[in-house]
Amino acid sequence: MALQVRVAPSKVVLQKFLLCVILFYTVYYVSLSMGCVMFEVHELNVLAPFDFKTNPSWLNINYKVLLVSTEVTYFVCGLFFVPVVEEWVWDYAISVTILHVAITSTVMLEFPLTSHWWAALGISKLLV
C-alpha cells in the first residue's frame, strides 16, 4: 500500500496561516485582558505579548498575567487551529510560534535570551 500525501496549493496554505496568526493574536489579547481582570492589573503595556524582559517572579503580578495568558493562548489556539487547518496543526502552530519569536525580536529590538520566556514557550508547545 502506497503512502498518499495531499499537498495544498500555496495560496490555501498562506490563507490558513494568516488566519491562524490573526486567531493567535486575538486569543492572546483576549487572554491578556481576562488575566488583567482576574489578577486586578489596572494597566498593562500594549506590547505585552512581546515582553520577555518582565522580572520572572511569582510576586510580580504582571509576570503572572503574561505567563498565564501565554499558556492559555497556546492551549486555546491548539483547539481553534484544528477546525481552521483540519490537518498539519503542529506545522501551523510551530510556524506561528516562529513568527511570534521574529515579531518579538523586532518589537523589543533584541533577541529573547531569557530562559523563563523560552521555558514558557516550550511548555506551551506541549499543550498544542
From Swiss-Prot:
Among InterPro entries, the record links this protein to: Integral_membrane_SYS1-rel
Q: How does it sit in the membrane?
A: Multi-pass membrane protein
Q: Which UniProt keywords apply?
A: Membrane, Transmembrane, Transmembrane helix
Where is it mainly found? membrane
Determine the domain of life of the protein's source: Eukaryota
Q: List the disulfide bonds.
A: none
Task: Provide the protein's localization.
Answer: Membrane
List residues traversing the bilayer.
Answer: 17-37, 65-85, 93-113
Q: Which GO terms describe its cellular component?
A: membrane
What name does UniProt use for this protein? Putative transmembrane protein 244
